[in-house]
């Protein structure tokens, strides 16, 4: 349970439960594929030998689409045929299976490069929605699979795909009776992980810059919490907050010029705005309670954060500039924490204690209703995908923590692969 509020470490023990205030406004939407669009992803026809283990890009595309919750992918063993494009597709057979879409393609070696053609077909109309051709190095086939997945997703759903994006997270392993913490970056499906930083002291709260070229995070390498910003291209890392007491929970402003952070330099944990070009800090909250875990609204005008000023942890908002005081957002349940604002500004994801379990929920700011998306019992650290259509979080608690994704409609929930140890604190 300690990690459910680990951005303030042992202060988490102060944040315990309260009786639910508006239980009728809590909706469970866990599991099921109702409303998902049926699609068949055909293994790409291959001419010649492709010198890479990533040649089955259809499998990557299938996994991506299924994980989104927007598609119900036909199992490969149920395919009635394996067309390579529009010209050799018998649409009547796929209509009989109830398919809405087909994804087909071909691959062949062209010198030292691979020529790849893919088509997205509309089964009902019997036509081609999209078709493209690529020529690339075999090592880039997995990236191409993510790009094709993004195209299919956007053509069908109307939202940008996120399969070609990257995630950051913290991996924890035991080595020679010591706990090793690693800051990692990987593809959105958890594949191709690479290490950014290793430490024998805790690393927490990674956060992407808006340009996605820098990570802010908390490190205890100096014996206490400090906030760093690291450039992923150059590797340069700068310590930007090392005040007395707690330095935690960095969150980027949409313009990339500021970080909202939690500091206790004045004796209490409050939210501050830190200007990156000169290090100037401005206090945004001034309360005896614990104020922590800030997250910006997409327009940068407001910040949501966790506070126990009402007696138990709940989500509040405040205006970054100008008039407007602190407003309480959540009243459903006895514990709501770790808010993350959706890219469209309409929802806040959070950790919600429901029926004794810590679960991921989404609070709709317009309807003021809370939807529970996961089963728990130890789910934490939710973060929206860049398109707002999925949420990544850490499940399993401190003993067996791993990353999972859940669609915002609750249709799909899948675990990401892990090479070893525990995976937690995702940033997307």
Curated annotation (Swiss-Prot):
Q: Name one GO cellular component term.
A: periplasmic space
* Species of provenance: Alkalilimnicola ehrlichii (strain ATCC BAA-1101 / DSM 17681 / MLHE-1)
The protein in question is named: Tol-Pal system protein TolB
Q: Which gene encodes it?
A: tolB
Q: Where in the cell is it found?
A: Periplasm
**Signal sequence extent:** 1-23
Q: Which family does it belong to?
A: Belongs to the TolB family.
Q: According to its UniProt entry, what is the function of this protein?
A: Part of the Tol-Pal system, which plays a role in outer membrane invagination during cell division and is important for maintaining outer membrane integrity.
- Disulphide linkage map: none
What is the top-level taxon of the source organism? Bacteria
Q: How does it assemble?
A: The Tol-Pal system is composed of five core proteins: the inner membrane proteins TolA, TolQ and TolR, the periplasmic protein TolB and the outer membrane protein Pal. They form a network linking the inner and outer membranes and the peptidoglycan layer.
List the InterPro entries.
6-blade_b-propeller_TolB-like, PD40, Tol-Pal_TolB, TolB_N
For this protein, the parts annotated as crossing the membrane are none
Identify the keywords attached in UniProt to this record, alphabetized: Cell cycle, Cell division, Periplasm, Signal
Q: Which PANTHER family match?
A: PROTEIN TOLB (PTHR36842:SF1), PROTEIN TOLB HOMOLOG (PTHR36842)
Which Gene3D superfamilies does this one have?
Answer: TolB, C-terminal domain, TolB, N-terminal domain
Q: An example of a Gene Ontology BP annotation on this entry? A: protein import
């Amino acid at each position: 349970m300690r990690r459910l509020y680990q951005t303030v470490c042992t202060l988490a023990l102060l944040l315990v439960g309260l009786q639910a205030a508006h239980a009728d406004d809590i909706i469970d939407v866990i599991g099921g594929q109702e409303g998902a669009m049926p699609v068949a992803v055909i293994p790409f026809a291959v001419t010649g030998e492709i010198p890479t283990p990533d040649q089955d890009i259809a499998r990557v595309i299938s996994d991506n689409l299924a994980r989104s919750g927007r598609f119900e992918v036909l199992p490969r063993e149920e395919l009635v045929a394996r067309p390579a494009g529009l010209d050799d597709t018998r649409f009547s057979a796929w209509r009989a299976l109830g398919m809405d879409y087909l994804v087909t393609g071909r691959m062949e070696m062209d010198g030292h490069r691979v020529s790849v053609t893919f088509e997205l077909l509309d089964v009902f109309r019997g036509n081609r929605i999209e078709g493209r051709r690529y020529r690339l190095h075999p090592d880039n086939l997995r990236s191409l699979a993510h790009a094709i997945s993004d195209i299919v997703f956007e053509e069908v759903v109307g939202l940008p795909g996120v399969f070609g994006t990257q995630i950051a997270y913290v991996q924890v392993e035991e080595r020679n009776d010591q706990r090793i913490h690693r800051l990692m970056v990987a593809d959105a499906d958890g594949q191709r992980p690479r290490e950014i930083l290793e430490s024998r002291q805790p690393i927490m709260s990674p956060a992407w810059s808006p340009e996605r070229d820098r990570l802010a995070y908390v490190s205890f390498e100096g014996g206490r919490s400090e906030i760093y910003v690291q450039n992923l291209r150059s590797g340069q890392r700068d310590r930007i907050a090392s005040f007395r007491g707690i330095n935690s929970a960095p969150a980027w402003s949409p313009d990339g010029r500021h970080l909202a952070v939690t500091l206790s330099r004045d004796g209490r944990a409050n939210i501050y705005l830190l200007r990156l070009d000169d290090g100037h800090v401005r206090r945004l909250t001034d309360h005896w309670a614990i104020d922590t875990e800030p997250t910006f609204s997409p327009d940068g005008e407001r910040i949501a954060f966790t506070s126990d000023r009402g007696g138990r942890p709940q989500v509040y908002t405040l205006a970054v500039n100008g008039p407007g005081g602190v407003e309480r957002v959540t009243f459903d349940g006895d514990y709501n924490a770790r808010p993350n604002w959706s890219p469209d500004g309409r929802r806040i994801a959070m950790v919600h204690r429901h029926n004794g379990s810590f679960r991921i929920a989404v609070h709709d700011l317009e309807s003021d209703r809370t939807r529970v998306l996961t089963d728990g019992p130890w789910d934490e650290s939710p973060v929206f995908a860049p398109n707002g259509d999925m949420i990544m979080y850490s499940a399993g608690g401190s003993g067996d923590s791993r990353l999972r994704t859940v669609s915002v409609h609750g249709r799909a929930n899948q675990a990401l692969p892990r090479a070893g140890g525990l995976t937690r604190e995702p940033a997307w």
